[in-house]
């Protein structure tokens, strides 16, 4: 039985596609082990089939000099730990999905001369993937990469982002109610949530009265936004973290979200129209480039956070929710450009390397 190690961590954008591929490869007869970090514990209920995983003792890099020193020490320890474990396991292939949690595993693969495959979800390659791009046999990408050097171009394969979200049957604004979904990313980076909440409260009465809001909120915003919606009679469901993303996305008439590639893949797989608000501090502005790409495909609207205020949010919502044809056009474009067979395409790459 061929052994495959997958490595991802930090955010759901890295963890979810890695966990999905881990399950699919295991179903195809591979022995799979997922190397990740503490953030995976938020997703164990979603992936109950994954029993073989290793939690690397990593922490966030940001937070001052002391935190940086702690991060470096834990990263070094994780490198040693990964090397010892991989020497014992003797994997046939290592697949890195980005984030610092993948660094120790990919470094160990390089030291052991084990073949490696990278998956870059975003349109701009992340730091860890850039480090190992030269070593990797294949660079699988979720979105078309903006810049790829001539030395790497032959390695790139556009496979999409593995997702378990299926195409929704429901058409946007097909019923009387309007299901608005506001997501903040797996790290709860929904600083724009209150802005859109205030904008929803200012929508024309004929639209506001039909709205049901499902919204991911940080702890500091939950009480404030709950009170705001209650005061304006807006039906709502708020939470810091949702586990049933497939149903939430599938039932949405319009989604408002950050522009991480995994979220985009889920939204497009469901064929949902969306407003994307890129996280300003995303590395190399990758969320901005992601959102601009989707906007150019006619599958979503990109609003930069620096230009976002209550007025612009209200106008965008009013224009879209008042135009069923526009939402349906965006929905069709999202479904048209989705890659629902990403896991199968990725498996074909793995099969080619290990069975070919």
From Swiss-Prot:
Membrane topology value: Peripheral membrane protein
Natural source organism: Anaplasma marginale (strain St. Maries)
Keyword Cell wall biogenesis/degradation among record annotations: yes
Signal peptide segment: none
Gene3D superfamilies xref list: Glycogen Phosphorylase B
UniProt function note: Cell wall formation. Catalyzes the transfer of a GlcNAc subunit on undecaprenyl-pyrophosphoryl-MurNAc-pentapeptide (lipid intermediate I) to form undecaprenyl-pyrophosphoryl-MurNAc-(pentapeptide)GlcNAc (lipid intermediate II).
Pathway(s) the chain acts in: Cell wall biogenesis; peptidoglycan biosynthesis
Alphabetical list of InterPro entries matching this protein: GlcNAc_MurG, Glyco_trans_28_C, GlycoTrans_28_N
SUPFAM superfamilies registered for this protein in UniProt: UDP-Glycosyltransferase/glycogen phosphorylase (SSF53756)
EC number, UniProt record: 2.4.1.227
Reactions catalysed, as given in the entry: di-trans,octa-cis-undecaprenyl diphospho-N-acetyl-alpha-D-muramoyl-L-alanyl-D-glutamyl-meso-2,6-diaminopimeloyl-D-alanyl-D-alanine + UDP-N-acetyl-alpha-D-glucosamine = di-trans,octa-cis-undecaprenyl diphospho-[N-acetyl-alpha-D-glucosaminyl-(1->4)]-N-acetyl-alpha-D-muramoyl-L-alanyl-D-glutamyl-meso-2,6-diaminopimeloyl-D-alanyl-D-alanine + UDP + H(+)
Keywords: Cell cycle, Cell division, Cell inner membrane, Cell membrane, Cell shape, Cell wall biogenesis/degradation, Glycosyltransferase, Membrane, Peptidoglycan synthesis, Transferase
Lineage: superkingdom: Bacteria
HAMAP family (UniProt xref): MurG (MF_00033)
Subcellular location: Cell inner membrane
Gene Ontology CC terms: plasma membrane
Name of protein: UDP-N-acetylglucosamine--N-acetylmuramyl-(pentapeptide) pyrophosphoryl-undecaprenol N-acetylglucosamine transferase
Keyword Cell cycle: yes
CDD domains assigned to the protein according to its UniProt record, in alphabetical order: GT28_MurG
Family stated for the protein in its record: Belongs to the glycosyltransferase 28 family. MurG subfamily.
BP term (GO), one: peptidoglycan biosynthetic process
């Amino acid at each position: 039985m061929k052994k495959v190690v997958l490595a991802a961590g930090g955010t759901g954008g890295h963890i979810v596609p890695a966990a999905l591929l881990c399950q699919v490869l295991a179903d195809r007869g591979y022995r799979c082990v997922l190397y990740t970090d503490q953030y995976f514990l938020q997703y164990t209920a979603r992936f109950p089939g994954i029993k073989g995983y290793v939690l690397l003792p990593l922490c966030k890099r940001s937070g001052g000099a002391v935190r940086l020193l702690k991060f470096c020490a834990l990263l070094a320890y994780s490198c040693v730990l990964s090397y010892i474990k991989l020497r014992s396991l003797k994997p046939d292939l290592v697949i890195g999905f980005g984030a610092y949690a993948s660094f120790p595993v990919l470094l160990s693969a390089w030291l052991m001369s084990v073949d490696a495959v990278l998956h870059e979800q975003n349109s701009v390659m992340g730091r860890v993937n850039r480090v190992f791009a030269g070593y990797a046999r294949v660079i699988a990408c979720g979105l078309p990469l903006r810049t790829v050097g001539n030395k790497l171009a032959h390695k790139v394969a556009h496979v999409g982002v593995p997702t378990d979200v299926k195409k929704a049957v429901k058409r946007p604004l097909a019923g009387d109610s309007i299901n608005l979904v506001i997501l903040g990313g797996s790290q709860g980076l929904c600083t724009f949530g209150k802005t859109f909440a205030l904008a929803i409260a200012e929508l024309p009465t004929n639209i506001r009265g039909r709205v049901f809001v499902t919204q991911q909120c940080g702890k500091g915003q939950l009480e404030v936004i709950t009170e705001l919606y209650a005061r304006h009679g807006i039906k709502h469901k708020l939470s810091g973290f949702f586990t049933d993303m497939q149903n939430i996305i599938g039932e949405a008439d319009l989604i408002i979200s950050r522009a991480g590639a995994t979220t985009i893949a889920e939204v497009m797989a469901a064929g949902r129209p969306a407003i994307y608000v890129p996280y300003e501090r995303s590395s190399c502005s990758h969320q901005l480039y992601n959102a601009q790409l989707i906007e150019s495909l006619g599958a979503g609207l990109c609003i930069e956070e620096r230009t976002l205020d209550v007025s612009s949010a209200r106008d965008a919502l009013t224009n879209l929710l008042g135009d069923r044809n526009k939402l349906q056009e965006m929905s069709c474009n999202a479904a048209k450009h989705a890659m629902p067979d990403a896991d199968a395409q990725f498996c074909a790459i793995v099969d080619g390397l290990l069975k070919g």
